[in-house]
């Protein structure tokens, strides 16, 4: 009998949520996702030293201004790690826009263009890249523009239905609704423990998946942020799931049978009118968990981006 991971791959596309190339080689996912925290972690792997050195050298050639060099080195390093991953995965890499641009539509679009250009200069077509943006109103609007240009986007830090609905209405290629961070909030708020089937994060992704399929939206649903394999098993049948190496290993070492839980709707119903900005902001604001977790997620990614830049600045000044 195939292990749990292999069974799962026959139902749902598995994506590796890591910048660790050795882990990606081990589990052979279709795609991979990175974020500022994972890039920071990857930058400390000794085997990646040459990628940092290349980013530093490139940044110095672009500008004499130290602040600009730091920014350029950060972008180039994220792309360098993405390029290494693309040598292994047959599909796509998700590379994230600086979290400090989460409320800046024009800045997000400009950064996306820069990242795509760096990949293209390295011989990688934009069809293999997903630009990751936070699911703020501005991030969703930036994604809408980028999708029109043929640049596919992955909308992340997605915690509630209003965010998911706005992404579908914007024609976004893929969303990453979070599971584990939703569970964290509810456990802290209620003091309760939840079974995998009752897990508020699992329920959220299931509802989003069902809504998308019922209304015929093409946006890919890729569940993210898992705390245990129980959550993953409950979402068997989701379009894609992005999973960290520790849980991938647990699945590879398990023979728990996998049963498809999510199924596409048989009948498609036309959706209603799109959410206005005011409606989106009000609906989002009504969800205390989503408000808190989005803000926290953006802050934490920005902190890790800052740590990475401090490290790169020291290298540039050396």
Swiss-Prot record:
Q: What is the lineage of its organism?
A: Bacteria, Pseudomonadati, Pseudomonadota, Gammaproteobacteria, Alteromonadales
Q: What is its main location?
A: cytoplasm
| Record keywords, A-Z | Cytoplasm, Pentose shunt, Schiff base, Transferase
Q: What binding partners and quaternary form does the record give?
A: Homodimer.
| GO term, biological process aspect, one | carbohydrate metabolic process
Family affiliation = Belongs to the transaldolase family. Type 1 subfamily.
Q: Which SUPFAM superfamilies does UniProt cross-reference here? A: Aldolase
The subcellular location is: Cytoplasm
Q: Main EC class of this protein?
A: transferase
Active site as annotated:
132 (schiff-base intermediate with substrate)
Briefly state the protein's biological role.
Transaldolase is important for the balance of metabolites in the pentose-phosphate pathway.
Record-linked NCBIfam families:
PRK12346.1, talAB
What's this protein's name?
Answer: Transaldolase
Q: Which reaction does it catalyse?
A: D-sedoheptulose 7-phosphate + D-glyceraldehyde 3-phosphate = D-erythrose 4-phosphate + beta-D-fructose 6-phosphate
Q: Which Gene3D superfamilies match?
A: Aldolase class I (3.20.20.70)
Q: Which CDD domains match?
A: Transaldolase_TalAB (cd00957)
Q: Could you tell me the EC number(s) of this protein?
A: 2.2.1.2
A Gene Ontology term for the protein's cellular component: cytosol
Q: Which GO terms describe its molecular function?
A: transaldolase activity
Q: Which gene is this protein's source? A: tal
The pathway entry for this protein reads as: Carbohydrate degradation; pentose phosphate pathway; D-glyceraldehyde 3-phosphate and beta-D-fructose 6-phosphate from D-ribose 5-phosphate and D-xylulose 5-phosphate (non-oxidative stage): step 2/3
